[in-house]
Amino acid sequence: MSHSLRIIFAGTPDFAARHLDALLSSEHQIVGVFTQPDRPAGRGKKLMPSPVKVLAEAHDVPVFQPSSLRPQENQQLVADLGADIMVVVAYGLILPKAVLEMPRLGCINVHGSLLPRWRGAAPIQRSLWAGDSETGVTIMQMDVGLDTGDMLYKLSCPITAEDTSGSLYDKLADLGPQGLLTTLAQLANGTAQPEVQDESLVSYAEKLSKEEARIDWSLSAAQLERCIRAFNPWPMSWLEIDGQPVKVWRASVIAEVTHAEPGTIVAATKQGIQVATGDGILSLESLQPAGKKAMSSQDLLNSRREWFIPGTRLA
């Protein structure tokens, strides 16, 4: 039986809320929750609370929403809670050194990769785009660096040929709470075994941009197919046809050699719109024109066949 800990939880999106939910069902005591300030959302730009705030308030846990933890008065909010440990999951604010050192056991973070690979903001998307065969979560002791702290616990899962960032997100949102509860038990019992990260194995997962999601036909078909899965559901891979953006939801690689220039449509069938790439052919199977719902290539061909005449060069 592990000892009950007084925990401050800091997180913002749904991924974080799933970890808070596991903690609320555990033997530990959540003494306070820190989450980002309410943000405008939706067409009406109404201020909306984060998923973490909604969950915390439903369980009558005190919620704090500073825009920064640098001011002394905001750091005092942390100190006054007298926590044993602070658990940080996709919080979105930097924790100053003073805050990291306040709880008796410091601060720990749930990171969505197998560190030291993919430190940074977009580990799920980068691992998928790179063609990694597995990913996972790492629970680490936080320090002032970017995901540089000692590793306390890891759980891994395979990346399948069908995975998107959305499906991987769900897998890691299930794995993370398991790893977190195990780590907390080890820390409470004094059995945790911190492991220093090997700096020679470090890679960085830079934040995604919408411009980066524009399909670059000079890449190989295999790279582009992974990119499309990595950028689903955000920011979504896209191409430009007739001056308007068209999102690509699903594609597959055709193992044929073509001598057409990258970006050239080589065939348009009900199975897919086949486009030459830097290496191989990419078949676009599910697309979404601006202002429309996602549709099969067959449905899009029925309404916009003039877009996909073989020999046409896509931007």
Swiss-Prot record:
It catalyses: L-methionyl-tRNA(fMet) + (6R)-10-formyltetrahydrofolate = N-formyl-L-methionyl-tRNA(fMet) + (6S)-5,6,7,8-tetrahydrofolate + H(+). Pfam families: Formyl_trans_C, Formyl_trans_N. It comes from the Bacteria. PROSITE patterns: GART (PS00373). (6S)-5,6,7,8-tetrahydrofolate binds at residues 113-116. InterPro entries: Fmt, Formyl_trans_C, Formyl_trans_C_sf, Formyl_transf_N, Formyl_transf_N_sf, Formyl_transferase-like_C_sf, GART_AS, Met-tRNA-FMT_C. Belongs to the Fmt family. HAMAP family: Formyl_trans. This is Methionyl-tRNA formyltransferase.
